[in-house]
From Swiss-Prot:
EC number(s) on file: 3.1.3.16
UniProt name for this protein: RNA polymerase II subunit A C-terminal domain phosphatase ssu72
Example GO biological process: positive regulation of telomere maintenance via semi-conservative replication
Species of the source: Aspergillus fumigatus (strain ATCC MYA-4609 / CBS 101355 / FGSC A1100 / Af293)
Matches recorded under PANTHER family: RNA POLYMERASE II SUBUNIT A C-TERMINAL DOMAIN PHOSPHATASE (PTHR20383)
High-level lineage: Eukaryota, Fungi, Dikarya, Ascomycota, Pezizomycotina
Disordered: annotated span: 1-47
Gene: ssu72
């Protein structure tokens, strides 16, 4: 305050009739301006807090385990961008007997179509075995099951936003940071397919497998565990971006990305200690 030029000028003006009233009004405005300027840099920090890794969940038919994980991630208190797939050649759902499954095509058959068909075939059977409840959940999450091998990384997915798919916001660019499969054979299929696709984007992606038995009860537990793993990974990514900046992140390089990649094995090991009944695998692959 003693160094404020307005106060010194007010001191020189003491003999004159206009006394020091002018200095007090500007004084708060000066400090107010300083506070505003100090508050502005905090805005980017808030935006970095809202950073979200993009996830992909995968099971055999994109029906039970991957969709429970899709639900958990897309409807979390702080939702994640998420897409989901199956790795099978066809979508297979239980039928009246083991030798009579209900079989559908990926990408062209909606969950609503499956629901209506099974409802018409035998409502009592498919209500009791949980298929109708599962399909009802699925059709409220996205349009229909997609096959992982048909996915082209980097191809825009804007139509999924317009369809109202849960978790679609943030995935419009057709890329993900993390893929989580729910069965080892699905993990093998994903890793093999990524190699066959040739890494056209040269973008790193962490591929995990969380081994979940294919029933509704185990899928519920597995979905909760996958959400926790996703949250731990996202917290670490956010920390590294705050420390090192986000430069190069989207291209899969930069100091923040390198530091995050190095932390992933430790994060998985810590998570596995809490979920010992869900054996996990991990590798780094490329889109």
């Amino acid at each position: 305050m003693a160094h404020d030029p307005r106060l010194s000028s007010a001191g020189t003006a003491t003999p004159n009739p206009p006394p020091p009233p002018p200095p007090p009004p500007p004084e708060p405005s000066t400090t107010g301006t300083g506070e505003t300027q100090a508050a502005e840099p905090s805005a980017p920090a808030q935006s970095s807090d809202s950073f979200k890794l993009k996830f992909c969940t995968v099971c055999a038919s994109n029906q039970n385990r991957s969709m429970e994980a899709h639900l958990r991630l897309s409807t979390a208190p702080s939702p994640f961008p998420v897409i989901s797939f199956g790795t099978g050649s066809l979508v297979r759902l239980p039928g009246p007997s083991i030798t009579q499954p209900n079989v559908y095509n990926f990408n062209t058959t909606s969950y609503s179509q499956m629901y209506d068909e099974l409802l018409a075939k035998d409502e009592r059977l498919y209500r009791n075995n949980g298929l109708l409840n599962m399909l009802d959940r699925n059709r409220n999450l996205k349009w229909g099951p997609e096959r992982f091998q048909d996915w082209v990384p980097g191809m825009p997915r804007v139509d999924h936003v317009s369809k109202g798919d849960k978790g679609a916001l943030g995935t419009e660019g057709g890329t993900v940071d993390v893929i989580i499969t729910c069965e080892e054979r699905c993990w093998d299929a994903v890793v093999d397919d990524l190699m066959n696709k040739g890494a056209a984007l040269n973008r790193p992606v962490h591929v995990f497998n969380v081994d979940i038995r294919d029933n509704h009860e185990e899928a519920l537990v597995g979905g909760k565990a996958i959400l926790e793993l996703a949250t731990r990974l996202n917290d670490a990514a956010t920390q590294e971006r705050k420390i090192h900046g986000a430069e190069g992140w989207e291209n899969g390089n930069g100091e923040a990305r390198r530091s995050f990649d190095e932390r992933v094995p430790e994060i998985l090991a810590s998570w596995q200690e809490k979920w010992p009944n869900l054996p996990a695998l991990w590798t780094l692959a490329w889109l």
